[in-house]
């Protein structure tokens, strides 16, 4: 019988702070943004942002999402 090692938990990192998001961090969120073409049709690609609970508890997740979206080109920077 062939045995495989199956990972049940894959750790994630916060997109803004690079902190490790632990399994017990129930305040963390993951935001998936789908890419669309010129006609507005989803093309199967997505960008993933993960935010840790520490960032959300301090009220900095909105500013972090705006900063990351500007870096990726989703928002204009003025």
UniProtKB/Swiss-Prot annotation:
Stored Pfam families: Ribosomal_S21e (PF01249)
Molecular-function GO term, any one: structural constituent of ribosome
GO BP terms, alphabetized: endonucleolytic cleavage in ITS1 to separate SSU-rRNA from 5.8S rRNA and LSU-rRNA from tricistronic rRNA transcript (SSU-rRNA, 5.8S rRNA, LSU-rRNA); endonucleolytic cleavage to generate mature 3'-end of SSU-rRNA from (SSU-rRNA, 5.8S rRNA, LSU-rRNA); translation
Tree of life domain: Eukaryota
Keyword Flavoprotein tagged: no
Keywords recorded for this protein, A-Z: Ribonucleoprotein, Ribosomal protein
Presence of keyword Cell cycle: no
InterPro entries referenced in this protein's UniProt entry, alphabetically: Ribosomal_eS21, Ribosomal_eS21_sf
Recorded GO CC terms: cytosolic small ribosomal subunit
Family indicated by similarity: Belongs to the eukaryotic ribosomal protein eS21 family.
Name of the molecule in the record: Small ribosomal subunit protein eS21
Source taxonomy: Eukaryota, Amoebozoa, Evosea, Eumycetozoa, Dictyostelia
């Amino acid at each position: 019988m062939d045995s495989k090692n199956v990972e049940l938990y894959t750790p994630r990192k916060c997109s803004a702070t690079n902190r490790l998001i632990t399994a017990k961090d129930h305040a963390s969120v993951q935001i998936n943004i789908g890419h669309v073409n010129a006609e507005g049709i989803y093309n199967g690609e997505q960008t993933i942002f993960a935010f840790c609970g520490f960032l959300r508890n301090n009220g900095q997740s909105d500013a972090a999402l705006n900063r990351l979206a500007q870096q990726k080109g989703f928002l204009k920077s003025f």
